[in-house]
């Protein structure tokens, strides 16, 4: 029974590493220990956060007054939602929870950055 549990844990760890390694910058794989994977996901999230900030600033410049106010409100609420949503994963059990939470932050931040990058195409 112990061998089965150890084998299952190893498979889950490898699957998580493979999943994390497929995300974001193709040149950067999030392989290694849990700590290394979490640090890698944090670095990728920081890259996407920078892109999101730049896109947000550009969208604010491009928007009219009413749109700017609404975008500011939406962005603040989106950040609260992202943080609360990813905290759900972080509160899970085991070390996989830290990886799941890191991937949640990375993927949601990437999606929002891409959405804001396309925002200028929808205004006017």
Predicted regions and their residues:
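Bacterial N-terminal signal peptides that target proteins for export
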Residues: 1-8
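N-terminal signal peptide c-region/cleavage motif recognized by signal peptidases
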Residues: 14-18
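N-terminal alpha-helical modules
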Residues: 19-124
């Amino acid at each position: 029974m112990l061998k089965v549990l150890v084998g299952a844990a190893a498979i889950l760890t490898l699957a998580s590493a493979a999943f994390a390694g497929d995300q974001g910058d193709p040149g950067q794989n999030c392989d290694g220990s849990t700590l290394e994977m979490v640090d890698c996901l944090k670095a990728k999230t920081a890259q996407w956060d920078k892109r999101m900030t730049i896109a947000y600033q550009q969208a604010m410049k491009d928007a009219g007054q009413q749109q700017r106010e609404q975008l500011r409100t939406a962005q603040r609420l989106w950040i609260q939602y992202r943080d609360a949503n990813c905290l759900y994963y972080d509160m899970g059990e085991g070390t996989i929870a830290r990886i799941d939470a890191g991937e949640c932050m990375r993927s949601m931040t990437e999606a929002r950055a891409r959405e804001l990058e396309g925002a200028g195409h929808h205004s006017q």
